[in-house]
Regions:
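An intracellular "coupling" helix at the cytosolic face of ABC transporter transmembrane type-1 domains
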Residues: 156-157, 173-182, 186, 190, ...
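Helix-loop junctions and hydrophobic alpha-helical segments within the transmembrane domains
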Residues: 58, 147, 151, 260, ...
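Helix-loop-helix
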Residues: 96-103, 109, 202-219, 286-359, ...
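Alpha-helical segments in transporter systems
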Residues: 30, 52-55, 63-88, 110, ...
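Transmembrane helices of ABC transporter permease
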Residues: 64-77, 114-117, 184-237, 309-322, ...
Length: 626
């Protein structure tokens, strides 16, 4: 049955629902909790709370902000003073009310003074712009730091249920939107308010009746602005949500580009991208259209107001109840009075975009961090590597149990293997040993101490992992290996590489250990990346080792090479092996066969073959394929 565009659109909406708060990854039972209900998308925080919290990041720069806002006051006063100076210049030197001739020398002197006043305003405006830019960037540094620091404290569960692309969108798009508001919008709101107050005072001083005419339109302008702001807020939140969904899809597609090409999924990917892209376009149009309506509406009302004021002012001049200089200045003030109102109204879209972005950033900051260590948690130095699981029961969701009554005992230096079908719970067990998740019942103990009573850093410092999905950081080969133990010497790094059988290929690289790796080690083969991962585990000197299908993604020849490194790595370490190829676990001290979250068989290779149970069928089936 063919899949229609409507079907794909429905699928995308389901997959990316609630992207504003979370973006579930599709992961199996053995790899993580899998898709969960969207969190927080339908209950955004209040605008006032987001604004108050955002302003707290400016408190450290109160002095610079104070100077900047003082400069705003100077600029506003200079602008208003310069504008009002036109009245005496016109009435005294250009068109005196008594009909006497003008005065060129006086005109030149008056214009020079007015230019000096405006120059003072220009200097103040430059200082204000520079200072607010520094304040905004300092605030962004603090926001990014808090966001990144918080993300280091979040549990693995958070990353299992959130899209990398959406999280990156919060770091980039949302934070940049906040920066734009802090650097310019705040000042424009303050200067606009100040201009309105100052202009209104001078308008009243110039002519109270024309001021009354000008103010007639203000309630209508405020009502229009409030209505547009009210309607546009929800659309700006939807826009940020759609942007996060699109970024998440792009990140997933680029990361999985090989899979896309292998399954000839290019056209489908383009179609799904088009659906998300068009959805973003529609939401952006709605948000930007409503936000952009503010300017034209205000301008039209301002033009009507200007025309009405000019007509009435002209009549007053004709009947000699007003002077030409006063009318000129007042018309200029009426423009200045409506301009900040227009500017403030046009900043509404920026404000709501920034607040929507702030809500998304703060939603990550407000996530529950990894549970703190118990008060009686102990430090463990020199672990021997004795691991005991006693009647462990666990589920990523309490109502869906994955591991049922798991018990096992590993003596220091033993090799324990887990085999079973995909989704049986093999990786979940290793996640629990690392305490990436807390169990529902039972105990996990290392060297006789419940891991809940061991400080997390100490626990994980004594456990090294080599995963199927290798990950290398941008940097030198030396730095990537040393990531396993930052205080390792160069000699220890080289020794670890030799133990992992990686030294020979490293020395063939252009700069040896100083060769800079591209993102995720893209300039190395899969096997070479895995050897560096093994070297990283070796340099850590951890007494407990976890190998999660470490050779399943390489060819047989490379696998033999990697196995040599792993054999040396496993010596004198308690090792837990998740096996894809059963030939790699034949020499394990104990093999645990898992099915549906339960250990259905256990024993060494020979004993399990004699039982002719599940392991026997798996092994002989593999042998026949080979």
């Amino acid at each position: 049955m063919s899949v229609t565009r409507a079907d794909r659109e429905a699928s995308l909406k389901k997959r990316y629902a609630g992207r504003v708060a979370a973006a579930p990854k599709r992961r199996g039972m053995g790899r993580g909790p899998g898709p969960g209900a969207p969190r927080g998308g339908g209950r955004p925080k209040s605008t006032g709370a987001a604004l108050k919290r955002l302003m707290s990041y400016l408190e450290a720069d109160r002095l610079r902000m104070g100077i900047a806002f003082f400069c705003v006051i100077v600029n506003t006063v200079a602008t208003l003073t310069g504008s009002y100076m036109l009245r005496p210049i016109i009435n005294r030197f250009i068109a005196p009310p008594d009909g006497s001739p003008g005065n060129v020398a006086g005109l030149f002197k008056g214009l020079t003074m007015m230019a000096c006043v405006y120059l003072l305003g220009v200097i103040a405006n430059y200082l204000q712009s520079r200072l607010m830019l520094e304040v905004a960037q300092s605030a962004l540094v603090r926001i990014r730091t808090d966001l990144f620091t918080k993300m280091q404290k979040l549990p693995v569960r958070f990353y299992d249920t959130n899209s990398n692309g959406d999280l990156m969108s919060r770091f980039t798009n949302d934070v940049d939107t906040i920066g734009n508001m802090l650097s310019s919008t705040l000042v424009q709101l303050f200067s606009g308010t100040l201009s309105i107050i100052g202009t209104l005072f001078l308008m009243l001083y110039t002519n109270i009746w024309l001021t009354a005419v000008t103010l007639i339109m203000i309630p209508l302008m405020l009502r229009a602005g409030g209505e547009v702001a009210k309607r546009s807020q929800k659309y700006f939140s939807a826009q940020q949500s759609a942007l996060g969904a699109l970024n998440g899809y792009i990140e997933e597609t680029i990361t999985g580009q090989k899979v896309v090409k292998v399954f000839c999924h290019e056209e489908i990917a383009e179609e799904e991208f088009d659906i998300l892209n068009r959805d973003l376009r529609e939401k952006q149009i709605r948000a930007q259209f409503l936000g952009g309506m503010m300017g034209p509406v205000m301008n039209n009302l301002s033009q009507v107001n200007y025309s009405l004021t000019a007509c009435i002012g002209g009549i007053l001049c004709v009947v000699k109840n007003f002077d030409v200089g006063g009318l000129t200045v007042f018309l200029n003030f009426s423009r200045q009075f409506s301009r900040p109102i227009n500017e403030i109204s046009m900043q509404v879209s920026n404000v709501f975009s920034a607040l929507a972005g702030a809500e998304r950033v703060f939603s990550v900051m407000d996530e529950e961090p990894e549970a703190a260590d118990d008060k009686d948690a102990v430090s463990m130095d020199g672990m021997r590597g004795e691991v005991v699981l006693d009647h462990v029961t666990f589920g990523y969701n309490p109502d869906k149990i994955i591991l049922k009554d798991i018990s096992l005992y590993a003596r220091p230096g033993q090799k324990i293997a887990f085999v079973g079908s995909t989704g049986a719970g093999k990786t979940t067990i290793t996640n629990l040993i690392n305490r990436f998740y807390d169990i529902q019942s039972g105990t996990i103990a290392i060297d006789g101490v419940d891991i809940c009573h061991i400080k997390r850093d100490d626990l994980r410092r004594h456990i090294a992992m080599v995963l199927q999905d290798t990950h290398l950081f941008t940097g030198t080969v030396m730095e990537n290996i040393r990531y396993g133990r930052l205080d390792a010497t160069d000699e220890e790094v080289v020794q670890a590489a030799k133990m992992a059988s990686a030294h020979s290929f490293i020395m063939r690289l252009p700069k040896g250990y100083d060769t800079v790796l591209e993102s995720d080690g893209a300039n190395l083969s899969q096997g070479q990346r895995q050897l560096l991962n093994i070297a990283r585990a070796a340099v850590s000197k951890a007494p407990i080792l976890i190998l999660d299908e470490a050779t399943s993604s390489v060819d047989t020849r490379t696998e033999k090479h990697i196995e040599q490194g792993m054999d040396r790595l496993m010596a004198e370490r308690t090792t837990f092996v998740i096996a894809h190829r059963l030939s790699t676990v034949r020499n394990a001290n104990a093999i645990m066969v898992l099915e549906n979250g339960e250990i259905i068989e256990r024993g060494d290779h020979e004993d399990l073959l004699k039982e002719k149970g599940r392991y026997y069928r798996l092994y002989t089936g593999m042998a026949e394929l080979n």
